């Protein structure tokens, strides 16, 4: 732990916080629109950076590099194949959300089905954030920072105690940032962190390969390409962690849900000043996802050659960073990892507050004819963020005892919440006659079936394939239920809150992105460098 790395870490982190504070100081957050949607005033560059950094947390740095170290590059499919889903979201989903004036995903479901469906989905979202998203983000950040710095080594605490302390440091910092600054402050810091992430992506291959080759960059690069090449393969076989076939089943569904229906992601897209800026922002985030294998995953590949048998494989990323990078770059990497963790944590907190205040608390006040003021709603939202933060910080350290790998644990648990929501939204998009009863029964059917087949019964089927099968069965279930309840025709109500003209030249850019997606899979295969 060098003084230079700590000083650079503190200076970079302080600069980002100060810059965000200066940019937002003249705009006090006094309305729910300002707290949750940055007053719909973000341009495409801010939207793209916010989308990318809300997606990239310490979970990816820790989880994906662990998977590459223990298995191979097949885990990159989560990010690279998501480009197709993101483009579909930009083309079809975003226009619907902007056109209907929906501020939350449950808000749209309330318009499409009914208010009880809106409440049910809001509760499922909140459970997902409190149980899965927020604790996992804190744990991933704690593992990364503990491995890189181990600030509290002089206290001679155990690894478990270190994790507890770092979880609370990240959680308290993130909570304060979200409560005081709102979505605008989060979006600005994300944009700066995107630049830092790109810098790391350029610098790490240089320093990592140079260290691997004992000072000779080309020798290190040759070692990476000629030894343990099985780890370079992104085309997963049946026994790999991510088989290739899952890209076309459960993974595609989860990616489409994540980028088009996950509240804390969609909320970033809806903060744009127009539909065109939102679509451009999504396209910019796609470019970032294509660069991620070169930015995020190189440490795992280098770690394969440096460490033959790690006891805690989740530590491979921080160990590689600590051993290969110079002090200033360690500080920058730590600042970006901390910033990414705080960014995703903040986005989840902000969305949790949005869901609670707009979909549960405000309707409860209206039902009782109580006075509602923007000031009171903002105050309630901030209090709720503090409560959710505390719950996440108390539960995060226990992820260490998960039997599955960290990233697999994260995706398995996430599937239980996201795919049923995806199903009822997709059916709502496609069919205008499916009633609210079908949506509620479909959600309950999916969640209980997934718990039984994935956690209670020992079904020898990859969880992503199981998610795809349950998606099909739940869709059939909803259509069957629809036959026994009175049908009604849903009529979309159009609310033009921002400029709705789409991005004119998007198809050329979309085509280039899809070509890039295929090229990266070919590169990391037996036809390429694997």
Locations of regions flagged by a protein language model:
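Membrane-embedded helix-loop-helix hairpins and adjacent transmembrane boundary segments
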Residues: 1-530
């Amino acid at each position: 732990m060098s003084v230079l790395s700590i000083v650079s870490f503190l200076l970079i982190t302080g600069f980002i916080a100060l810059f965000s504070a200066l940019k937002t100081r003249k705009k006090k957050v006094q309305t729910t629109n300002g707290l949750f949607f940055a007053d719909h005033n973000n341009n495409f560059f801010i939207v793209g950076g916010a989308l990318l950094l809300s997606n990239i947390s310490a979970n990816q740095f820790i989880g994906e590099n662990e998977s590459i170290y223990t298995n191979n590059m097949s885990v990159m499919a989560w990010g690279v194949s998501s480009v197709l889903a993101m483009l579909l979201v930009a083309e079809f989903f975003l226009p619907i959300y902007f056109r209907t004036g929906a501020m939350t995903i449950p808000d749209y479901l309330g318009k499409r089905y009914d208010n009880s469906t809106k409440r049910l989905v809001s509760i499922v979202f909140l459970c997902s954030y409190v149980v899965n998203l927020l604790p996992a983000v804190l744990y991933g950040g704690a593992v990364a920072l503990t491995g890189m710095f181990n600030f509290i080594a002089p206290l001679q605490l155990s690894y478990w105690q270190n994790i507890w302390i770092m979880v609370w440091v990240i959680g308290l910092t993130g909570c304060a940032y979200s409560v005081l600054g709102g979505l605008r402050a989060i979006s600005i810091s994300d944009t700066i962190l995107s630049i830092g992430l790109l810098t790391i992506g350029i610098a790490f291959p240089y320093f990592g390969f140079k260290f691997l080759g004992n000072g000779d960059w080309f020798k290190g690069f040759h070692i990476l390409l000629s030894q343990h090449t099985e780890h370079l393969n992104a085309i997963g076989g049946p026994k790999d962690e991510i088989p290739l076939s899952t890209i076309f089943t459960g993974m595609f569904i989860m990616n489409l849900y994540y980028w088009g229906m996950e509240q804390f992601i969609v909320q970033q897209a809806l903060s744009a000043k127009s539909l065109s800026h939102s679509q451009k922002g999504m396209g910019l985030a796609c470019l970032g996802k294509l660069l991620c294998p070169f930015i995020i995953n190189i440490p795992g590949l280098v770690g394969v050659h440096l460490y033959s048998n790690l006891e805690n494989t989740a530590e491979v990323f921080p160990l590689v960073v600590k051993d290969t990078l110079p002090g200033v770059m360690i500080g920058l990497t730590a600042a970006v990892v901390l910033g990414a963790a705080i960014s995703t944590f903040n986005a989840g907190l902000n969305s949790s507050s949005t869901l609670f205040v707009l979909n549960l608390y405000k309707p409860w006040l209206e039902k009782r004819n109580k006075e509602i003021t923007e000031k009171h709603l903002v105050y309630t939202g901030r209090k709720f963020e503090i409560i959710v933060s505390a719950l996440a910080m108390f539960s995060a350290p226990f992820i260490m005892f998960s039997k599955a790998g960290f990233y697999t644990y994260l995706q398995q648990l996430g599937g239980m919440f996201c795919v049923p929501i995806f199903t009822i939204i997709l059916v709502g998009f496609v069919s205008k006659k499916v009633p609210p009863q079908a949506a509620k029964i479909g959600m309950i059917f999916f969640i209980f079936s997934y718990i039984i087949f994935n956690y209670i019964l020992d079904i020898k089927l990859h969880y992503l394939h199981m998610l795809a099968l349950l998606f099909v069965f739940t869709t059939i279930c909803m259509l069957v239920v629809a036959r026994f309840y009175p049908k009604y025709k849903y009529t979309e109500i159009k609310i033009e809150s921002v400029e709705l003209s789409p991005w004119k030249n998007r198809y050329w850019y979309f085509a280039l992105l899809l070509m890039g997606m295929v090229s990266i899979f070919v590169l990391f295969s037996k036809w390429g460098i694997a």
